[in-house]
Amino acid sequence: MTSPTFIRLRFAFKLSFAIVAALFLGFHLQLETPRWSVLTAAIVAAGPAFAAGGEPFSGAIRHRGWLRIIGTFIGCIGGLIIIVLTIRAPVLTLMLCCLWAGVCTWISSLVRVENSYAFGLAGYTALIIIVTTGETPLLTPQFAVERCSEIVLGIVCAVMADLLFSPRSIKQDIDRLVDKVLLDQYRLLQLCIRPAEKTDIDRAWNDLVKNTTALNGMRSYLMMESSRWQRCNRRLQVLHTESLTLITQACETYLVLANHPDILTAELKAMLSEPAPTPAEIHQRMKTLRQFIAVSHSEAIPHTISSWVGAATRYLLLAKGIHTNSSISRVEEGILAGVVPVKHVSAEGHHAMINGLRTGVATAIGGLFWLWTGWTSGAGCMVMIAVVTSLAMRTPNPRMVAIDFLLGVIMALPIGALYFMFIIPATQQSMLLLCISLGLLAFIIGIEVQKRRLGSLGTLASTINIMVLSNPMEFNVSLFLDSALGQIVGCFVSLIVLLLIRDNAKDRTGRTLLNRFVYSAVSALTTNKARRNENHLPALYQQLNQLLMMFPGDIDKYRLALTLIIAHQRLNKTEVPVNAELSAFHKQIRYTADRVINAKNSQKRRYYFARLLQELDQYQQKLVDYQSPDAVTRPVKRLADMLHKYQSALI
């Protein structure tokens, strides 16, 4: 029952059932174009499977369904507004729709990746409505309502198929990953105190950052499964912070030991070096370490080690609650209430603008070419351009997504022709035969989708789209060929646009991210208690993960970013003297660091960065004048030296 083959076959059957149910109910309820409900069921069920490379979790399917509903409704409302305002000017209507698609793509590039699908869908939904009702604009409201109804029906069928045939809960995977992350955290600390080779440590913390990010991403899917996981969701949110704290403290321990190898006593090092292959054994180790720290002198225990043990203790307490989903205790409530996460602003503003420009320009060119030539395949081509350019932009490799779509529509032509010209006409007298034939196609492609076969998802969606499943069915070969040709040309044009309009914002975005790490470090210099209690770690590590995705082979950037995160944490824990002059200087330093981020050109950025270094030198002198202890002056000096050393990478 748990073998990979059985799981693949089970999902393929789920996909077939969802598509067949949407087809049957679409005809039974007398919907005008059941194709949309069938296509929605296929995309909602198969999309997460292609992304996961296997059977998706129930929460992923429902999350995808909700995003499709939201995107469809936003797109329908946008299309209706454009039609109402410009009904007497068809060309202006089409150009406004292209602008709408570009704006939606721009927004989808700024929001969280898991929610970007809704805005991409909203962009091309409005275009589909306007293109479809171009000759009868007065019927646009009716078409929008019908499309929304068909979309909702397809989503209901996909969710029901998952519920009926053994839904896959994400909870067990969360439990396993929670334990794995804890074990990996302990191993990372052991590597840092040994110390091991830099490459081994880099690999260990890189994997931990990815697993911690993945664990946090599972929360939304868990909440989509059932409301009874609310307590787990709260614990997971704080567990994410504790895991990031453990990574930071372990890496800071490595840096401290590199400069002061004798700071760790032999007894403490021996205790930390003892193996602990299970969470239960780590729990026992933490008990022993807490007792040892309690009876030891405070100066005998490095601050990073005591902080690591404290974070690991909180992690263990939260992990136990996640496994059992029990009521939140008073101690846990104190931990949960003490975390105030800070949301970060996207650093991909320029990248998002390029994405919106690609979609807007590509759809506008397709629309003008359609209006100029009167090409019968122009509408389908224009819609396909919008679909590909909207959905590909937020992926790590948009060009490969466009190629996937192109291969899919090419494969859909012979498969769709076989069904449209031979199989479907032969099953017109029997709904059962029609459902079996379409279900068989879905079953075969459902297996390939889980293998992430290039072109498989595009083949499924494109084949359903060109079959023109309408009520009543009309077998117009010319219409079929126009639709198929429009899809192929649209995907090809989209690929050409992606290749011609290059995104050169990668280096700029990477530099912006690094300068944001600098800003977070200097902003920790504050006497404001509310600001010091803010939790920046999730936002900082989210930006670090983004840096990992953008520059997968540049280990120097990761080390610099991680060192700046460590500097932020160290300065945030430093007791800065309360002084009006120092507080005013803190504001000035933050302002200068912000100007470095928002500088319009390299000359201004270089000027403000030099000013920031000068202000940090002045700040160090003020700390000396006010006789601040070494615990305050040393971290500030370390940060200033780091910025001097790596200024070429930051400007």
Swiss-Prot record:
<feature type="transmembrane region" description="Helical">
    <location>
        <begin position="429"/>
        <end position="449"/>
    </location>
</feature>
<dbReference type="GO" id="GO:0005886">
    <property type="term" value="C:plasma membrane"/>
</dbReference>
<dbReference type="InterPro" id="IPR006726">
    <property type="entry name" value="PHBA_efflux_AaeB/fusaric-R"/>
</dbReference>
<keyword id="KW-1003">Cell membrane</keyword>
<comment type="similarity">
    <text>Belongs to the aromatic acid exporter ArAE (TC 2.A.85) family.</text>
</comment>
<feature type="transmembrane region" description="Helical">
    <location>
        <begin position="91"/>
        <end position="111"/>
    </location>
</feature>
<dbReference type="GO" id="GO:0022857">
    <property type="term" value="F:transmembrane transporter activity"/>
</dbReference>
<feature type="transmembrane region" description="Helical">
    <location>
        <begin position="481"/>
        <end position="501"/>
    </location>
</feature>
<dbReference type="GO" id="GO:0046942">
    <property type="term" value="P:carboxylic acid transport"/>
</dbReference>
<keyword id="KW-0812">Transmembrane</keyword>
<dbReference type="Pfam" id="PF04632">
    <property type="entry name" value="FUSC"/>
</dbReference>
<protein>
    <recommendedName>
        <fullName>p-hydroxybenzoic acid efflux pump subunit AaeB</fullName>
    </recommendedName>
</protein>
<keyword id="KW-0472">Membrane</keyword>
<feature type="transmembrane region" description="Helical">
    <location>
        <begin position="119"/>
        <end position="139"/>
    </location>
</feature>
<dbReference type="InterPro" id="IPR023706">
    <property type="entry name" value="PHBA_efflux_pump_AaeB"/>
</dbReference>
<feature type="transmembrane region" description="Helical">
    <location>
        <begin position="150"/>
        <end position="170"/>
    </location>
</feature>
<keyword id="KW-0997">Cell inner membrane</keyword>
<keyword id="KW-0813">Transport</keyword>
<feature type="transmembrane region" description="Helical">
    <location>
        <begin position="405"/>
        <end position="425"/>
    </location>
</feature>
<feature type="transmembrane region" description="Helical">
    <location>
        <begin position="368"/>
        <end position="388"/>
    </location>
</feature>
<feature type="transmembrane region" description="Helical">
    <location>
        <begin position="67"/>
        <end position="87"/>
    </location>
</feature>
<comment type="function">
    <text>Forms an efflux pump with AaeA. Could function as a metabolic relief valve, allowing to eliminate certain compounds when they accumulate to high levels in the cell.</text>
</comment>
<feature type="transmembrane region" description="Helical">
    <location>
        <begin position="41"/>
        <end position="61"/>
    </location>
</feature>
<feature type="transmembrane region" description="Helical">
    <location>
        <begin position="11"/>
        <end position="31"/>
    </location>
</feature>
<keyword id="KW-1133">Transmembrane helix</keyword>
<feature type="transmembrane region" description="Helical">
    <location>
        <begin position="460"/>
        <end position="480"/>
    </location>
</feature>
